[in-house]
Amino acid sequence: MATKIDKEACRTAYNLVRDDSSAVIWVTFKYDGSTIVPGEQGAEYQDFIQQCTDDVRLFAFVRFTTGDAMSKRSKFALITWIGENVSGLQRAKTGTDKTLVKEVVQNFAKEFVISDRKELEEDFIKNELKKAGGANYDAQTE
């Protein structure tokens, strides 16, 4: 059966993360049968990491505060998590299903496809977002 997405519910969750006045910094999009729906959400990145277990595949939209001493700003990441115990067929479908998620999640600085929990470390993701952000003025700090 072809995968579908609940666009309205997913868009609501996506906008919650994009809203700087919201405490929610991440949301997952998971499978409910053959439909992608919003999953968990939260204000702590470590809580998101707990969702990424070996037997699940999910998509996540995460807000990080990056920048240097001169300018702090929000950067967004689209993370595709595929656990080690996910079957080959489901792994393959995840790649094509991501196009549905991208119909909703359209603004992000960098995209990650991760199956190793070490790559979920906050410092690793922030460093990659910093590289994607262009100019770095950290050398000007005293």
UniProtKB/Swiss-Prot annotation:
One of its GO terms (cellular component) is site of polarized growth. InterPro entries: ADF-H, ADF-H/Gelsolin-like_dom_sf. The modification N-acetylalanine is found at A2. Residues 2-130 form the ADF-H domain. GO terms for molecular function: actin filament binding. Keywords: Acetylation, Actin-binding, Chaperone, Cytoplasm, Cytoskeleton, Nucleus. It is found in: Cytoplasm; Cytoplasm, Cytoskeleton; Nucleus. It holds the Pfam family Cofilin_ADF. It comes from the Eukaryota. The modification N6-acetyllysine is found at K102, K126. One of its GO terms (biological process) is regulation of actin filament polymerization. Interacts with 5-lipoxygenase (ALOX5/5LO) in a calcium-independent manner. Binds to F-actin with a stoichiometry of 1:2. Binds to F-actin in a calcium-independent manner. Has no direct effect on actin depolymerization. Acts as a chaperone for ALOX5 (5LO), influencing both its stability and activity in leukotrienes synthesis. This is Coactosin-like protein. It comes from Bos taurus. The lineage of its organism: Eukaryota, Metazoa, Chordata, Craniata, Vertebrata. The gene is COTL1.
